[in-house]
């Protein structure tokens, strides 16, 4: 077992409905890691990518209330240009997007609540300068959110 792939763990989205909403040339990734340790591992993986091919990093994050949101976000301090927080609609324990934005801000990140992943992608696309390197976008914070994203994108796990 030298190579194992887990759907929803640093999974690249190369095509689909949500990918089409992002700024042209964007890299979209999903990761369902939802605790501070997972945040560190994902941040390290993104730092390696950044060394090879630099791109501005944006997070689109939704989390549930049983997780340590602030310390999850701390792993991305100094890396993420901005965080869009979204509701997790498939769990009753989803943290309201406004509250999650406050947790990201506590961790030192620029953050704003939006209503959906699609809204975040459209907002980013509408404000993106064509002269800038296309962004790397990580959709993260909850396996529930990853499931929603894969379904909405039209790329459910095999």
Language-model-detected regions and their locations in the chain:
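Surface-exposed, flexible loop/turn segments at secondary-structure boundaries
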Residues: 18, 65-67, 91, 119, ...
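Nucleotide phosphate-binding/pyrophosphate-handling subdomain across enzymes
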Residues: 1-82
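C-terminal helical cap/extension that packs against the catalytic core
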Residues: 25-30, 36, 73-135
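Glycine/aspartate-rich loop-and-adjacent alpha/beta segment that forms the canonical ThDP
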Residues: 142-158
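Cofactor-binding loop segments of dinucleotide-utilizing enzymes, especially the Rossmann-like FAD-
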Residues: 61-65, 88, 141
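Active-site catalytic pocket residues across diverse enzymes, especially alpha/beta-hydrolases
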Residues: 46, 50, 104, 128, ...
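Short, flexible loop segments at boundaries between secondary-structure elements
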Residues: 8, 88-91, 158
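Canonical bilayer-spanning transmembrane alpha-helix
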Residues: 136-140
């Amino acid at each position: 077992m030298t190579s194992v792939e887990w759907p929803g763990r640093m999974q690249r989205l190369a095509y689909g409905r949500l990918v089409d909403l992002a700024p042209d040339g964007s890299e979209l990734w999903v990761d369902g890691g939802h605790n501070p340790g997972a945040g560190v591992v994902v941040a390290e993986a993104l730092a390696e990518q950044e060394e090879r091919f630099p791109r501005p990093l944006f997070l689109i994050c939704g989390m549930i209330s049983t997780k340590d949101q602030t310390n999850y976000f701390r792993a991305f301090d100094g890396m993420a240009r901005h965080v869009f927080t979204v509701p997790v609609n498939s769990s009753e324990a989803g943290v309201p997007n406004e509250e999650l934005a406050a947790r990201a801000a506590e961790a030192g990140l620029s953050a704003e609540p939006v209503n959906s992943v699609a809204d975040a992608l459209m907002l980013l696309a509408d404000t993106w300068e064509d002269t800038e390197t296309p962004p790397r976008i990580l959709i993260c914070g909850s396996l529930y959110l990853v499931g929603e994203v894969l379904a909405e994108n039209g790329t459910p796990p095999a």
